Amino acid sequence: MSRGLGDVYKRQVITGLTVVLPNGDIINTGSRTKKTSAGYNLTNLFIGSEGTLGIITEVQLRLSPIPESIMAAVCHFPTLEKAVQTAQQVIQYGVPIARIEMLNKDQMGISINYSKLKDVEAVPTLFFEFHGSEQSNNENIKVVEEISKENSGSSFKWAKDLEDRNKLWKARWDVYYSVKALINNGRVYSTDVCLPISNITECVNYAEEQAKKFGLRAPMVGHLGDGNFLSLIHI
């Protein structure tokens, strides 16, 4: 189970492709079998090429069942280091979790103002999502809450109903639009960096320093499950 955005990574759910090559030839990649040793792994090659090796016209996907229960939680932290450390420990302890998202202090403040959020602090914040049975989700939430508290986490809240889950994640869902609303005729450019989660804190701190150095405002959102974070730069 992915700890980034969704149940599994894209490469894991794509089983085959139909691709039009530059010379006009049409090829099919992949296999219906779970394993194959016949030839090169062209499916992953074309996924990683981002359209430079051929135009993908059809995609074969492996479907997953809808989880019996989906729950969400949020937790505030005094520092970015504490938030990242919590995510690291949740993953290291093998807690089954579908998503771990992070907003830095600046982005939380922007989201709070834009979405008129109450009882939410402008501090580094983690957003969790759990998939599974209701019993397993309840157990995993307790584990994550305990890990969060050990890392100085506060205001831990969780919900299971869709409306309540959306309220908890409101600051996360409105990231792009909240940043866009800060500028009139300018644009928002998104960077996309992926690195070992142990290096996230150092990299984010450096990115924040560079943004200040050049007079830019660049709030950040992180997909900590896969060590990915984005800076939303105002131009």
Stretches with model-predicted labels:
Residues 6-23, 55-58, 123:
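Structural signature of FAD isoalloxazine-binding scaffolds in flavoprotein oxidoreductases
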Residues 31-32, 59:
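Residue-level structural signal for beta-strand termini and adjacent loop
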Residues 1-5, 9, 233-234:
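Single conserved hydrophobic/aromatic residue that forms the stacking wall/gate
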Residues 20, 47-48, 56-58, 62, ...:
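Short beta-strand-to-turn element immediately C-terminal to the catalytic PLP-Schiff-base lysine
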Residues 65, 74-233:
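C-terminal substrate-recognition/cap domain of FAD-linked oxidoreductases
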Residues 35-37:
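Flexible, small-/acidic-enriched active-site or ligand-binding loops
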Residues 17-31, 69-86:
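Short, conserved aromatic-histidine micro-motifs
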